[in-house]
């Protein structure tokens, strides 16, 4: 949340932060950065926020974790009441929520609301779910590896679902296969370099980029301390 707010305050396009539930034990700077958006603790508050904001789909991301653990995508049709929750989390009788490392879709209302209550009860942030660009029936986003002021690597991550993390056996694709216009690649590069420049002591980062469906306008989803390119070697040509 703090990183996302820093990027947004600098005028860089991001997937918007909608709400949060930051535990008191988090560092004060993280709480301060998240104070500009509402706090929600349960499914009822989430539905109220979505209806008030006229938003039908959101991402729920835990404050702690990696490899898509706990990351969930929620879609709600206000008029019909139909719901769908995409998540790797599953209820466990002893442990509460467990990470299955496999994306599942839940559509039963009672099950969805129960899972949402548990997910939102943990430290998390909520972001707007933007429709991603598509390639041959897959939605995709980009993972950029930026080091020492240059873009070293750019990889597409393809998925049939809303979550593209490669840890979920999604499909990596070389950026050249997308045949993106040079102007789009230039815009992605410029955005990544501007983001890294906001952190003078940071020499490398893995930056997740969403390309909006239709316009291909880039938005930063998040920044990571490592490139995390599974099965890829950015130095393979050395």
Language-model features, listed with the residues they occupy:
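A short acidic-Thr-Gly-centered motif at the start of a beta-strand
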Residues: 48-53, 212
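Phosphate-binding site of ATP-dependent enzymes
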Residues: 53-166
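Short, surface-exposed charged micro-motifs
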Residues: 143, 208-210
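Short secondary-structure junctions
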Residues: 10-12, 54-56, 198-203
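C-terminal active-site "lid" helix and adjoining low-complexity regulatory extension at the edge
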Residues: 166-204, 211-238
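Short, flexible loop/turn elements at secondary-structure junctions
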Residues: 21, 64, 75, 130, ...
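Conserved N-proximal alpha/beta basic substrate-recognition cap immediately N-terminal to
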Residues: 1-48, 66
């Amino acid at each position: 949340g703090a990183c996302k707010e820093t990027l947004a305050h600098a005028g860089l396009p991001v997937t918007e932060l909608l709400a949060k539930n930051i535990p008191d034990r988090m560092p004060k700077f993280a709480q301060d950065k998240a104070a500009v958006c509402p706090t929600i603790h349960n499914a009822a508050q989430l539905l109220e926020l979505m209806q008030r904001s006229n938003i039908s789909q959101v991402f729920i991301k835990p404050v702690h974790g990696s490899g898509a653990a706990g990351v969930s995508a929620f879609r709600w049709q206000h008029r019909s009441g139909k719901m769908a929750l995409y998540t790797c989390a599953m209820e466990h009788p002893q442990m509460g929520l467990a990470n299955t490392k496999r994306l599942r879709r839940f559509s039963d209302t009672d099950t969805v609301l129960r899972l949402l209550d548990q997910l939102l009860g943990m430290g998390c942030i909520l972001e707007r779910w933007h429709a991603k660009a598509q390639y041959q029936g897959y939605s995709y986003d980009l993972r950029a590896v930026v080091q020492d002021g240059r873009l070293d690597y750019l990889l597409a991550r393809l998925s049939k679902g809303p979550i593209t993390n490669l840890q979920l056996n999604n499909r990596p694709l070389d950026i050249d296969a997308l045949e993106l216009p040079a102007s789009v690649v230039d815009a992605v590069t410029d955005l990544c370099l501007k983001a890294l420049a906001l952190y003078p002591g940071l020499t490398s980062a893995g930056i997740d980029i969403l390309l909006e469906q239709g316009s291909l306008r880039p938005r930063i989803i998040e920044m990571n301390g490592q490139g995390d390119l599974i099965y890829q070697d950015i130095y393979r040509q050395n």
